Amino acid sequence: MPAKISRAAYADMYGPTTGDKVRLADTELFIEVEKDFTTYGEEVKFGGGKVIRDGMGQSQVSRADGAVDTVITNALVIDVTGIYKADIGLRDGRIAAIGKAGNPDTQPGVNIIVGPGTEAIAGEGKILTAGGFDAHIHFICPQQIEEALMSGLTTMLGGGTGPAHGTLATTCTPGSFHIGRMIQSFDAFPMNIGLAGKGNASLPAPLIEMIKAGACAMKLHEDWGTTPAAIDNCLAVADDHDVQVMIHTDTLNESGFVENTIAAFKGRTIHAFHTEGAGGGHAPDIIKVAGLPNVIPSSTNPTRPYTVNTIAEHLDMLMVCHHLSPSIPEDVAFAESRIRKETIAAEDILHDLGAFSIISSDSQAMGRVGEVIIRTWQTADKMKRQRGKLPEETGDNDNFRVKRYIAKYTINPAIAHGVSKHIGSIEVGKRADLVLWNPAFFGVKPEMILLGGTIAAAPMGDPNASIPTPQPMHYRPMFGAYGKAIAASSVTFVSEAALSDGLQQKLGVEKGMLAVENTRSGIGKKAMVFNDATPHIEVDPETYEVRADGELLTCEPATVLPMAQRYFLF
């Protein structure tokens, strides 16, 4: 017979439901459940005396007849598509259904069939997000990949060949030889990966060669000479082959000013890296491009958010990363021209306005590969504390702000780089690259990372213990990170030209390949979910003050951040 229980008891048993609120880690961000797909009284839950048992919540349906491979029960989804409670069904490494799981023979409204061949992951009281996408990677060392995975990232895009000096400074893999060797190495890594070729050339042939060799994007970097001619040529080749172009512009303004670079774009779509400028770019006003409709602006995480320590740490980082010498006055002047508190403070606010669309790392090259997610939510928290409620919020919650910020490391880089058909959000048909979180540790320490529907990483206790939880508890690779499961669970993103030319067979790799698509004129700033603002941005050349649509953008540096020392005592 039906029974009534309190909201608190229900949340304790099945997790929060419609109207309940959840605090994210130790931030001041509070989400409210917008919808619950369950049928009250028919919830499924695994365990002794629970519902997912033979003849109850578990049906007799085989996998061949439609039962899912895995069900994640009663998870609170935080995604650009909504903040809702649902069961998630996975099949063949992709999201098969979202809604109500169970046994259709005994329960109403079931659209996710649980059968004898179904594994269960308990999502009660947990948060589920899409895996993160870091689109600004210097592949300096392979150990970055495990660090990124353990933080909740499931896709990395960038360039490099290891600790070569070109890679230490620039995110590109130059030439078909290096692209081939890097792709061959990817069979060892549980991570979706895409490579950017070097885009700095004034004639098309070398760039076309790299795209056909497997580059899924091209990178223009000032250390290789980002001249107007190189910009124009690279964008023309990208338009012909449907790959994205990322740009790090000319800090020293040697080959032109920001206006010359904008003119070289000719209105074509481009992804502008560290658009504030501390990571590089026309000094002091590269930030202007964040207001253009054809520019997709991103940040790297060392400037996220602006704190009392930001300026001091940047100078030393820059000297190391760009092969500069503190004993050469010109090198010191170059470094100091890039680090401006005024533009970094404005960057915080432009993120909160939705004018900056993406947050990435700049791994080991003035950025921390394991902190993309942490720095994103620290920025969101700082902005809520300093700027208050966003005008777009409709309830007594931070749902809109949370969707705006999660888009910055999930769907927006996926759209920008032509892979949103496969990753970037929790939607039916997309890859089951998913991250489960305890709300108290949200954004800081994941509870489980799934790659292609297989558990690839998780915190795990002593393997010799009688239960999984005794110390030492730390992150360890799981079965999805070993053997042939790696190639079956993750993919390499390449150009359509490379895929159709049989690159996988030519290189003899096991990991599957997917082609990027719709990276050019079909997208732009307006394609950036919840982050499509195009204010007119001006920078005072003397004071570096930044204005958007005439309004001065400034904020105080944070002295204390959430998601920091409280979580990293050990």
UniProtKB/Swiss-Prot annotation:
It comes from the Bacteria. Pathway: Nitrogen metabolism; urea degradation; CO(2) and NH(3) from urea (urease route): step 1/1. Residues 131-570 form the Urease domain. Carboxylation allows a single lysine to coordinate two nickel ions. Pfam families: Amidohydro_1 (PF01979), Urease_alpha (PF00449). Ni(2+) 1 binds at residues 136, 138, 219, 362. This is Urease subunit alpha. It comes from Chelativorans sp. (strain BNC1). The lineage of its organism: Bacteria, Pseudomonadati, Pseudomonadota, Alphaproteobacteria, Hyphomicrobiales. The gene is ureC.
